[in-house]
């Protein structure tokens, strides 16, 4: 069994903040400079779509604070209506974030657009995107199955909206907010369950609690002034490295400058409550976001994880694949409910976990919004081939388990990690003692 030690200063920049910084930069008046922008495939898809819509932008490598280089993106825009027709379908590749949030912006532009993606993205449901945009006055056409291609007939006459999110979704919340920026009047977005709040923080939107629900106020046609953004390290990426340390006794890894926004760092609370040896150091606030360093040590006894609270599930939705694999390998069992959103990600992640954990000898029982895993890992064959289902988080979750435990696991598609974590395998190599 391997041991992993070291300091991580090359974690990918936060994917969610990178998307939003680029989109807000394209809506702002002036020059927006984004330091430490993500080089992952999804974030590059967002830049590609902005460029195709006529938004001037540049991207270059500059020296990083810990050595090496980081990515700086500069976007120049004249405000909300700086977008131009592309003349061709806008290629989002595998990025659901790009497709959904761009739909909100394009709904407010006075021209038609078409959003497309790769085979995986074209199967993902988009009805929740279409509904509020149609209510605001935009035309939205989907396939008969409610998926992309998404054809949008934008308009400068969008109506304000009062929209209650039916399920927690930061992407749907964000696309409604981006559309509402173009509307004539004030819109309100109601969240019964809090989801990640980067969009409202970065736009400076007013949010308050009313009768136990969160209400976000979006003023229409407000001038957005360009400002610089510094993107911290991605907590969803940090989750994999923390799990690596926890699964490998004797390991000790320090991860620098990680986003610790409360809507993103709940996975740490779950791991600590289960017995994980994790401490947070150098906590501070930069650009409205909590940032800190995470120290994770292996060797402790981890209790089985059971996640059911809807608010908690919403805050760890991207980390559930890694939490599931961590719990099964460390304790033999795992349980989650109220997580139906996982079935609409890059793949049906609940089913993907069940398929692969069964290949490892686990007993898995799926429900519409969750799963129960028991029996522990007891693979009968070697190597065990893990089907990645074109999903970076499924691939990385099982890759971490293989590295930490020494189990002979083969990924069906290791290249898919480049969607969010291009240096994933190189980083694992550098940490192994």
UniProtKB/Swiss-Prot annotation:
Residues noted as binding phosphoenolpyruvate in the record, renumbered to the chain: 15, 96, 124, 171, 349, 393
Class in the EC hierarchy, top level: transferase
UniProt keyword Cytoplasm, yes or no: yes
Residues that bind 3-phosphoshikimate: 15-16, 20, 169, 171, 318, 345
Reactions mediated catalytically: 3-phosphoshikimate + phosphoenolpyruvate = 5-O-(1-carboxyvinyl)-3-phosphoshikimate + phosphate
Record's subcellular location: Cytoplasm
Active site (UniProt): 318
MF-aspect GO terms: 3-phosphoshikimate 1-carboxyvinyltransferase activity
Domain of life: Bacteria
Pathway info: Metabolic intermediate biosynthesis; chorismate biosynthesis; chorismate from D-erythrose 4-phosphate and phosphoenolpyruvate: step 6/7
Entry's Gene Ontology cellular component terms: cytoplasm
Matches recorded under InterPro entries: Enolpyruvate_Tfrase_dom, Enolpyruvate_Tfrase_sf, EPSP_synthase, EPSP_synthase_CS, RNA3'P_cycl/enolpyr_Trfase_a/b
Gene3D superfamilies: Enolpyruvate transferase domain
Keyword tags: Amino-acid biosynthesis, Aromatic amino acid biosynthesis, Cytoplasm, Transferase
Any one biological process term the GO annotation gives: amino acid biosynthetic process
Enzyme Commission number(s) from the entry: 2.5.1.19
Subunit structure: Monomer.
Function according to Swiss-Prot or TrEMBL: Catalyzes the transfer of the enolpyruvyl moiety of phosphoenolpyruvate (PEP) to the 5-hydroxyl of shikimate-3-phosphate (S3P) to produce enolpyruvyl shikimate-3-phosphate and inorganic phosphate.
Similarity field: Belongs to the EPSP synthase family.
Protein name as it appears in the record: 3-phosphoshikimate 1-carboxyvinyltransferase
């Amino acid at each position: 069994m391997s041991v992993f030690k070291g300091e991580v200063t090359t974690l990918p920049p936060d994917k969610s903040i990178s998307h939003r910084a680029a989109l807000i930069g394209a809506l702002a008046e002036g020059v927006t400079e984004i330091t430490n922008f993500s080089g992952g495939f999804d974030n590059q898809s967002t830049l590609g779509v902005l460029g195709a819509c006529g938004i001037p932008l540049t991207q270059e490598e500059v020296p990083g604070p810990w050595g090496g280089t980081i990515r700086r993106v500069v976007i120049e825009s004249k405000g909300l209506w700086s977008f131009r027709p592309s003349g061709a379908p806008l290629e989002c590749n595998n990025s659901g974030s790009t497709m959904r949030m761009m739909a909100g912006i394009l709904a407010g532009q006075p021209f038609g657009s078409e959003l497309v993606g790769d085979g995986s993205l074209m199967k993902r449901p988009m009805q929740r995107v279409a509904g509020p945009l149609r209510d605001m006055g935009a035309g939205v056409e989907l396939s008969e199955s409610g998926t992309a291609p998404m054809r949008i007939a934008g308009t400068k006459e969008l109506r304000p909206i009062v929209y209650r999110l039916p399920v927690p979704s930061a992407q749907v919340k964000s696309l409604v907010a981006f559309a509402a920026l173009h509307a004539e009047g004030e819109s309100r977005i109601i969240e019964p369950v809090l989801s990640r709040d980067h969009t409202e923080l970065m736009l400076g939107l007013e949010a308050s609690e009313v009768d136990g629900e969160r209400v976000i106020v979006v003023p229409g046609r407000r001038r957005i002034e360009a400002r610089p953004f510094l993107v911290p390290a991605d907590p969803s990426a940090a989750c994999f490295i923390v799990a690596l340390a926890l699964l490998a006794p004797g390991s000790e890894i320090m991860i620098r400058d990680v986003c610790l926004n409360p809507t993103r760092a709940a996975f740490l609370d779950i791991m600590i409550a289960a017995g994980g040896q994790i401490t947070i150091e150098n906590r501070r606030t930069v650009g409205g976001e909590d940032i800190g360093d995470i120290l994770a040590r292996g060797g402790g006894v981890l209790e089985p994880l059971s996640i059911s609270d809807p608010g908690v599930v919403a805050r760890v939705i991207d980390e559930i694949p890694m939490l599931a694999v961590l719990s099964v390998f460390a304790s033999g069992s795992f349980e989650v409910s109220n997580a139906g959103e996982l079935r609409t990600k890059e793949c049906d992640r609940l089913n993907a976990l069940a398929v692969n954990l069964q290949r490892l000898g686990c007993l898995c029982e799926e429900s519409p919004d969750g799963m129960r895993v028991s029996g522990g890992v007891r693979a009968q064959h070697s190597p065990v081939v893990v089907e990645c289902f074109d999903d970076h988080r499924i691939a990385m979750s099982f890759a971490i388990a293989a590295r930490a435990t020494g189990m002979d696991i083969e990924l069906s598609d290791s290249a898919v990690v480049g969607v969010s974590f291009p240096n994933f395998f190189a980083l694992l190599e550098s940490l192994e003692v």
